[in-house]
Amino acid sequence: MVVEVLRLGHRGDRDKRISTHVALTARALGAEKIIFTVEDEHVESSVKKVVENWGGNFKFVVEKHWKRYIREFKKRGIVVHLTMYGANINEIMPEIRELSKEKDILVVVGAEKVPKEVYELADYNISVGNQPHSEVAALAIFLDRLFEGKTLYRDFENAKIKIVPSNHGKVVIREK
């Protein structure tokens, strides 16, 4: 299974930090690619710098034709839209996990008001709670549940920086 995240919309300076966090969360918790629908060189370079230093093969892509991307993706996988209006994650996650054994997953998270077409194109509209909260939180919970916690402490290949879990102090290994 390959997991990709589609960041739908991005409002320049207003969303720069949160969009970066969406991408970093996607990378850290098991996604292989993030797709932005709007170009932002600052966010892209921040994410690529993290990949360069912390390792892995995470990809950053800009695709302005998001509807076409979703339709094409559906030929090989399922589309999951994270929204507070969706079905309860606890009820639907076993089905998603079962499907993920044979299909890739595209997770859609919005930055602004999500167009009605997203709800219609998605195979699943899933809520991580029914209260307002961050798309970063929703994505983190979804990916953690999807991978059942297995991605939290994985090693990233080609990492120049690694953290060694420690109860006391900071233990950082840097490649020389």
Residue ranges and their predicted role:
Residues G30, K75, L121-A122:
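Short, structured coil segments at secondary-structure junctions
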Residues E44-V114:
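S-adenosyl-L-methionine/SAH cofactor-binding core of RNA-modifying enzymes
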